[in-house]
Amino acid sequence: MSITAQSVYRDTGNFFRNQFMTILLVSLLCAFITVVLGHVFSPSDAQLAQLNDGVPVSGSSGLFDLVQNMSPEQQQILLQASAASTFSGLIGNAILAGGVILIIQLVSAGQRVSALRAIGASAPILPKLFILIFLTTLLVQIGIMLVVVPGIIMAILLALAPVMLVQDKMGIFASMRSSMRLTWANMRLVAPAVLSWLLAKTLLLLFASSFAALTPEIGAVLANTLSNLISAILLIYLFRLYMLIRQ
């Protein structure tokens, strides 16, 4: 059976339109969870203000130089802020991936689905999804730090791993290995979608500061919701593609 990207795009668009409100609510809930967790675990405003005290930003040649010029207390505050942002983002992404994939499974089985039901049904797989997304993010970030291109390649090769983990109940490393093999064999179908997703997320990041015109909290929720919707579209595409490849 010949699979064309155009047919998968069409199926993705139809599913997204038909389930838009449910996907929007899941995206909004995940964005809210991400922002709340980030706020809870982040340093206080007073602590964050200390980061600017006595640090010669203009004279620093790079990020590592800037960090080296910080006091141990400032470095600890920066580490806490970075860890809070990373942890809350990973939690939100894991819930989003689990929720969206469960929506697809439930709808495909002819069952009625709501945002809360999808998230609740995904609860048993969230720990494995969290670890998978953490490892994937780590590998992609390391690749981007090296020469950028390896990170993009890793993002493409591991794209199907969450779908395989949930749909086929694979282990974390088994899903990563299987994703690499299957994606490599179907690069022409996976790569354009992942690259479009990366481009859309980058463009959103460039305009993210404009959302803060509302209030920082509302702006963060809105930006995260839009980011989640972009990721949801990619997940729908990858799930549909994986089902067609398996046939």
Swiss-Prot record:
Family matches, as Pfam families: UPF0259
InterPro entries, per the entry: UPF0259
Could you tell me where this protein is found in the cell? Cell inner membrane
Q: Name one GO cellular component term.
A: plasma membrane
Q: Tell me what topology the record assigns in the membrane.
A: Multi-pass membrane protein
Could you list this entry's UniProt keywords, alphabetically sorted.
Cell inner membrane, Cell membrane, Membrane, Transmembrane, Transmembrane helix
Q: Which residues cross the membrane?
A: 20-40, 87-107, 118-140, 152-172, 187-209, 225-245
Where is this chain primarily localised? Answer: membrane
Similarity comment text for this entry: Belongs to the UPF0259 family.
The protein's name: UPF0259 membrane protein YciC
Q: Which organism is it from?
A: Escherichia coli (strain 55989 / EAEC)
Task: List the lineage, top down.
Answer: Bacteria, Pseudomonadati, Pseudomonadota, Gammaproteobacteria, Enterobacterales
